[in-house]
Amino acid sequence: MVAHPDDCVIFAKPFIDTHDQFDWQILYLTYAQFEPRGKEIAEYWAKQGILTTHLGFTDDYQDMENNALSFNHEQAAREIVNICQPYDLVLTHNPDGDYGHIHHKFVSQCVTESGIPAIYFASQGKENLTCGAKNKVMLEDLPLHREVIEQFKN
C-alpha cells in the first residue's frame, strides 16, 4: 500500500523482486487507473504479473507545503483499511513517511491502525534501490515517473 505511483518502484521493488513467493497486488492512494501516471504504472506492473488498484485521491504537492491533506482523509482512511483487510501482510511506508512526506505518513498510519501486520520501507530510498533487486528498473517503461525515480538513485 503506497501513496503515489512511483513509490513502489522507488521503495518496494527490490523487496517484491526478492520475495516472489508472495502473490503481490499494489494499492495506490493517489491517481486513478485511467490517468496517465496511473495507467503507465499499472502497465509497468502488469508486465510483471502484478495487479494494481488506484483509490484516485488527488496528489496535491501543496499538501507538503501546507502540512495538511487536501483530500477527504476520513474517506481515504476508510478505503485504505477496507482494501487492505483481505491481506495477511502489507508492505508500506514507514511511520516517518520515508523522508517525511505527508501522504506517506498518512498511508503508514492507516495501515498501522488497520491492525494488519506490516513491513515498512527503509527510511531512505537509496537503500531500497541498491538492496539487490533481481530485475533492474526499466526507466524507459516509466517516462512519466523517471524524473522522480532518478532522484532516489545514488
Q: Could you describe each region identified by the protein language model?
A:
Residues 1-86, 116:
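Active-site rim/loop-helix segments in enzyme catalytic domains that contact anionic ligands
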Residues 68-154:
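Metal-dependent de-N-acetylase/amidase catalytic core
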